[in-house]
């Protein structure tokens, strides 16, 4: 997959094409909103996305600014915060005073509304729930993803199943039908629908973790 500048260039190329379409269609653009799967440092507009190699203090704003005409503002925020804004605007959190949105994908994050405001927190890190330690002992060898993410994110579910298939030499189920290194969360859900025992075990644990995290987060409101 793409890393570092390759991802930034791809985003800039897509933005340039969209701006060209808007110009040719005589669509006026006031601003551009971008959400990223990580943290945006508001003082510098640089970003950190742990699941994108090379995006540590990455100058995404400068990359996008280079293809954007003067006068058009660029706003970058975390995906979890943007999800929450969307729910406030047109979704389940419309007119809500306090709410939490848990986003499960490659990683895990949470958008949080308190007193009608979407929170950003110290260093814009609020809602980075993937590092929540929900089960002892905390697995330091997975600190790149975090305890909660290891058990219940897309990447984590795939990693847990790969570990389980490697460890169980007698296992002959559906997940053995492809190279272990290529097993993804998609494969796990597919195997779950066919009652695969490893998929069932891993996904039941993920559901348990989602429930625990939801209960803990709600208690903060």
Task: Annotate each PLM feature.
Residues 34, 157, 210:
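Residue-level signal for inorganic ion chemistry
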Residues 14-21, 201-221:
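Phosphate/ATP-binding catalytic cores across multiple sugar-kinase/actin-like superfamilies
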Residues 1-4, 68, 73-75, 89-205, ...:
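Glycine/GP-enriched mid-protein hinge/lid loop-to-helix segment characteristic of carbohydrate kinases
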Residues 20-27, 167-173, 216-221:
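Surface-exposed helix-capping loop/turn segments at secondary-structure junctions
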Residues 42, 113, 220:
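Short, acidic, Ser/Thr-enriched surface-loop or helix-capping motifs
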Residues 37-40, 105-107:
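Short glycine-rich anion-binding loops that position phosphate/pyrophosphate groups of nucleotides
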Residues 1-12, 16, 20-32, 38-98:
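Glycine-rich phosphate-binding loop and adjoining helix at the ATP-binding site
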